[in-house]
Amino acid sequence: MLQRARLWPPIFTSRCAPFPFSRSISIPYRRMAGVPSTYDAPVHIAVIGGTGISSLPGFELAATLDVDTPWGKPSSPISILQHNSPTTGKPVPVAFLSRHGLHHEHAPHEVKNQANIAALRHIGVRTIIAFSAVGSLQEEVRPRDFVVPDQIIDRTKGIRPFTFFEKGMVGHVGFGDPFDKSLAEIVRKCGHSLEGEGVRLHDKGLLICMEGPQFSTRAESNLYRTWGGSVINMSALPEAKLAREAEISYQMICMATDYDCWRGDGSEDVNVEMVMAHMKANAENARRFVGAVLNELTKEEHGELVLAKHIEGQMRFAGAMTKKEGRGQDAEKKLQWLFPGYFD
């Protein structure tokens, strides 16, 4: 069974501040002999993608981490890769996590979102670039176009665990702008630098996140169009909400692979073959786009943004609403693990 946001093409470099390397490595499906299982330095940037992430020119594999969290293990081991910063020349680590598992074993409602975000924060991540294949809900968003969404409508059904604050620890966080505006600007800058070479980028868009794993009915697809929906997937939530609770800057990059099922007489309805064909055809553009964003983020000038200083500490107050005597012991321990020093 496949679903949008499940398979993402291998990531390579781009011409937007190109990498000074040509060698590529493959992210392993099992631990490679001699690869460390620990990494001592904090890792501030992460990529969450599908099982298709398989090679990254310019990166060297530094470690493969099996992280345990109070919410269980994440969807996959975390691969730590390094490349030299284009401004300082120093090695910069980037974490990679496969949303649906190394073998694509987690359906959208089974993705271990809490463990994924908790594990990334625990190793130091404060910026996440997420990737998703999407269906287009508008004529102008063509298959193979990229979209940097700025809003989400939640059409999941409460099946997926969607908060860290529950069972005796209440916390509320703002989600008016579900994606980080400053991070989005960097993503757009890199995308526009590639336009004219097969890349078409839409700066904004309303993303509908549905439950899945089935695709939409025609009535649903047309309803979402009347709401102003631009694209639709099954992966943005609760991932983005949990990232906000974890004080992590988050932006998703979407690649359209189909027109869902609203267009024409039904002969163009989304199917797995259609999705895979467009992803394969657009793989090189996706690699270049992703590589450009990562290379830009590792520049020294973006240090404050990458550390998410603009949202640091927001949960210290928002998550401390429950008085000490009313807190669930297990819930408090979990949050103390996620936010050391916040709720002591």
From Swiss-Prot:
Record-listed E.C. numbers: 2.4.2.28
Top-tier EC class: transferase
Gene3D superfamilies: Nucleoside phosphorylase domain
Superkingdom to which the source organism belongs: Eukaryota
Binding residues for phosphate: 51, 99-100, 132-133, 235
Keyword Transferase: yes
Predominant subcellular localization, coarse grouping: cytoplasm
Site (Important for substrate specificity): 216, 272
Pathway stated in the Swiss-Prot or TrEMBL entry: Amino-acid biosynthesis; L-methionine biosynthesis via salvage pathway; S-methyl-5-thio-alpha-D-ribose 1-phosphate from S-methyl-5'-thioadenosine (phosphorylase route): step 1/1
GO CC annotation: cytosol; nucleus
Alphabetized InterPro entries for the sequence: MTAP, Nucleoside_phosphorylase_d, Nucleoside_phosphorylase_sf
Protein location: Cytoplasm; Nucleus
Gene Ontology BP annotations: glutamate biosynthetic process; L-methionine salvage from methylthioadenosine; purine ribonucleoside salvage
Catalysed reaction equations from the record: S-methyl-5'-thioadenosine + phosphate = 5-(methylsulfanyl)-alpha-D-ribose 1-phosphate + adenine
Pfam families: PNP_UDP_1
Any GO MF annotation of the entry: mRNA binding
Residues given in the record as substrate binding sites: 234, 258-260
Keywords: Cytoplasm, Glycosyltransferase, Nucleus, Purine salvage, Transferase
Family: Belongs to the PNP/MTAP phosphorylase family. MTAP subfamily.
Quaternary structure and partners: Homotrimer.
PANTHER family: S-METHYL-5'-THIOADENOSINE PHOSPHORYLASE (PTHR42679:SF2)
Function according to Swiss-Prot or TrEMBL: Catalyzes the reversible phosphorylation of S-methyl-5'-thioadenosine (MTA) to adenine and 5-methylthioribose-1-phosphate. Involved in the breakdown of MTA, a major by-product of polyamine biosynthesis. Responsible for the first step in the methionine salvage pathway after MTA has been generated from S-adenosylmethionine. Has broad substrate specificity with 6-aminopurine nucleosides as preferred substrates.
Protein name from the UniProt record: S-methyl-5'-thioadenosine phosphorylase
